[in-house]
Amino acid sequence: EIGYTQSADVLTLVHRGNAPRTLGRTGHTSWTLSTITFAPETQPPTGLSGTGSAYSYVVTSFYDDTGEESVASAAANMDETSTLSFTAPASGPVPDRYYVYKMKPANGLYGFIGEAVGTTFTDSTIIPDLEDTPPQARNPFAATDDYPSTVAYYQQRLAFGATNNDPDKVWLTQIGRFNNMNVSVPQKADDALTLRISSNEVNRVQNFAPLDSLIVLTSGAEHLVTSGDSAFSVDNIKIKPQDYRGSTALKPIILGGDILFVQGQGNVVRSMSYALESDSYRAQDLSILSRHLFVNNS
């Protein structure tokens, strides 16, 4: 039961017993199978230094082409009016700018105070913005029983679903950064997301059907994950059950606006589509007149 999705020459492969991988085609006869590293490509600066010790500072690197921010550097202490200096990262993309964060004494949280194009920054007693904090490294698929079993692209994010430890969860990467699961506190609009498809019982996420909204097919029900007219973010996601048929792990087929999937029980093929009269998605039985074709084929 290998889950997969494709973008151009890159196939993303998932299986509940193995770490996620990509299969990339680099030539007509050249293929590369790689384990996905869930971390930003952009690296933080190193060697932070300043004068004094009253405040703690960290710095991140930012790369304009991808909009990706690194995790925070190692911290350095200095006085509030000193100049902070640091060294550009030795590997990864060359940063276009650096973001500087400061932690007030006994606060415990770093807040944004400014950006630098070069490798120095002078703090002129700037009050940190605690609504804007540096990204925190996160890899939800780092261990056995934490490997996802289904995957799909949706709204410039890569969605993963169903580990052995969390069969009813969905994880979405940062926008446009398909190997980046990092988050900030509080979360930002383009941060990675984690959703639990709650129901009266724990139903395993079997597949995704990315349409105008994201349809999540589980072992016991079909759910609509929507954000209205806005892009997915932590503030606007709604999860609504649509029907209670249940699906197998067999990948659904999308034809126009219809989703064809195999029901989890009963040798039934269903077509799920939007029904105007109920303002929801309903799964109709396509095999009702041809039951004989599906006998002993569940």
PLM feature spans:
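Disordered, low-complexity "stalk" and linker segments at domain junctions of extracellular
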Residues: E1-Y154
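Beta-sheet-dominated scaffold domains
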Residues: E1-T5, V151, R157, N165, ...
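Conserved, compact domain cores that house catalytic/ligand-binding motifs in diverse enzymes
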Residues: D146-V183
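Secondary-structure junction/capping motif
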Residues: G67-S70, T173, Q265-N267
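Trp- and S/T/G-rich repeat-edge/linker motifs of beta-rich repeat architectures
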Residues: L23-Q43, E115, T125-T144, G176-E201, ...
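Predominantly extracellular/luminal cell-surface or secreted proteins
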Residues: T60-D64, Y101-P105, G161, K169-G176, ...
